[in-house]
């Protein structure tokens, strides 16, 4: 009976296989939770945006300045300021006035402005970046129609110039955690089943020769 108990013990290779399977299962579950809570909501809002044609109504600075954070090395950080420019457009789908934003991230970071420049240490460089962007919309785009994206149910008063996420990125972010979970389950189940079959075969052999 003692020998039969010993035969149920897993070998070092089997133990490593089960540990690997459990690691993949836990990693897959944690990845799904992380993506679900931290990334899924803004991504779905972005993907729910409908494409439309927009034309510029006005481009202007509103006289307010906002802070941004710049980096100047590994342990070097600071804040500087940039002026707020607003680009109002006409949305062809709803035929209404809306504030243009670069993308979903910019909208969530500063919903009052249309553009956030790459943050530099000098305020003057930030102002120049905003001015160049403002002139681009005034002179080069003007009244030309362009593609924009809006979500009538979430933020009908805002439109996006581009989407940050697409369906392929969303698929990959959920595909690989699920694959890791399934592979982990298969490794654990197959290892346990293989061990169980080996133990049964050993028991049958002992009964046969006893």
UniProtKB/Swiss-Prot annotation:
<keyword id="KW-0597">Phosphoprotein</keyword>
<dbReference type="GO" id="GO:0005267">
    <property type="term" value="F:potassium channel activity"/>
</dbReference>
<protein>
    <recommendedName>
        <fullName>Calcium-activated potassium channel subunit beta-4</fullName>
    </recommendedName>
</protein>
<comment type="similarity">
    <text>Belongs to the KCNMB (TC 8.A.14.1) family. KCNMB4 subfamily.</text>
</comment>
<keyword id="KW-0325">Glycoprotein</keyword>
<dbReference type="GO" id="GO:0005513">
    <property type="term" value="P:detection of calcium ion"/>
</dbReference>
<comment type="function">
    <text>Regulatory subunit of the calcium activated potassium KCNMA1 (maxiK) channel. Modulates the calcium sensitivity and gating kinetics of KCNMA1, thereby contributing to KCNMA1 channel diversity. Decreases the gating kinetics and calcium sensitivity of the KCNMA1 channel, but with fast deactivation kinetics. May decrease KCNMA1 channel openings at low calcium concentrations but increases channel openings at high calcium concentrations. Makes KCNMA1 channel resistant to 100 nM charybdotoxin (CTX) toxin concentrations.</text>
</comment>
<feature type="transmembrane region" description="Helical; Name=1">
    <location>
        <begin position="20"/>
        <end position="40"/>
    </location>
</feature>
<feature type="topological domain" description="Cytoplasmic">
    <location>
        <begin position="1"/>
        <end position="19"/>
    </location>
</feature>
<feature type="topological domain" description="Extracellular">
    <location>
        <begin position="41"/>
        <end position="167"/>
    </location>
</feature>
<comment type="subunit">
    <text>Interacts with KCNMA1 tetramer. There are probably 4 molecules of KCMNB4 per KCNMA1 tetramer. Interacts with FMR1 (via N-terminus).</text>
</comment>
<dbReference type="GO" id="GO:0099508">
    <property type="term" value="F:voltage-gated monoatomic ion channel activity involved in regulation of presynaptic membrane potential"/>
</dbReference>
<feature type="glycosylation site" description="N-linked (GlcNAc...) asparagine">
    <location>
        <position position="90"/>
    </location>
</feature>
<keyword id="KW-0813">Transport</keyword>
<dbReference type="GO" id="GO:0015269">
    <property type="term" value="F:calcium-activated potassium channel activity"/>
</dbReference>
<dbReference type="GO" id="GO:0006813">
    <property type="term" value="P:potassium ion transport"/>
</dbReference>
<dbReference type="GO" id="GO:0005886">
    <property type="term" value="C:plasma membrane"/>
</dbReference>
<dbReference type="InterPro" id="IPR003930">
    <property type="entry name" value="K_chnl_Ca-activ_BK_bsu"/>
</dbReference>
<feature type="glycosylation site" description="N-linked (GlcNAc...) asparagine">
    <location>
        <position position="53"/>
    </location>
</feature>
<dbReference type="Pfam" id="PF03185">
    <property type="entry name" value="CaKB"/>
</dbReference>
<keyword id="KW-0407">Ion channel</keyword>
<keyword id="KW-0812">Transmembrane</keyword>
<keyword id="KW-0406">Ion transport</keyword>
<keyword id="KW-0472">Membrane</keyword>
<feature type="transmembrane region" description="Helical; Name=2">
    <location>
        <begin position="168"/>
        <end position="188"/>
    </location>
</feature>
<keyword id="KW-1133">Transmembrane helix</keyword>
<dbReference type="GO" id="GO:0019228">
    <property type="term" value="P:neuronal action potential"/>
</dbReference>
<dbReference type="GO" id="GO:0008076">
    <property type="term" value="C:voltage-gated potassium channel complex"/>
</dbReference>
<dbReference type="GO" id="GO:0001508">
    <property type="term" value="P:action potential"/>
</dbReference>
<feature type="topological domain" description="Cytoplasmic">
    <location>
        <begin position="189"/>
        <end position="210"/>
    </location>
</feature>
């Amino acid at each position: 009976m003692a020998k039969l108990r010993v035969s149920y013990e897993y070998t070092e290779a089997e133990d490593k296989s089960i540990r690997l399977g459990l690691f993949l299962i836990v990693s897959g579950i944690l990845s799904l939770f992380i993506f679900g809570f931290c990334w899924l909501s803004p991504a779905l809002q972005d993907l729910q945006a409908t494409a439309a044609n927009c034309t510029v109504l006005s481009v202007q600075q509103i006289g307010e300045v906002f802070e941004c954070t710049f980096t100047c090395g590994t342990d070097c950080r600071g804040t500087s300021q940039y002026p707020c420019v607003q680009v109002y457009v006409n949305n062809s789908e709803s035929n209404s006035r809306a504030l243009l934003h670069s993308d979903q991230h910019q909208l969530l970071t500063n919903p009052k402005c249309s553009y956030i420049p790459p943050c530099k240490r000098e305020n003057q460089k930030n102002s120049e970046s905003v001015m160049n962007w403002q002139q681009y919309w005034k002179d080069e785009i003007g009244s030309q129609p362009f593609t924009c994206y809006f979500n009538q149910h979430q933020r009908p008063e805002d439109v996006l110039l581009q989407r940050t996420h697409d369906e392929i990125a969303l698929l990959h972010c959920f595909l690989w955690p699920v694959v890791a979970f399934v592979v982990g389950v298969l490794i654990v189940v197959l290892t346990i089943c293989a061990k169980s079959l080996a133990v049964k075969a050993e028991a049958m052999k002992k009964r046969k020769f006893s």
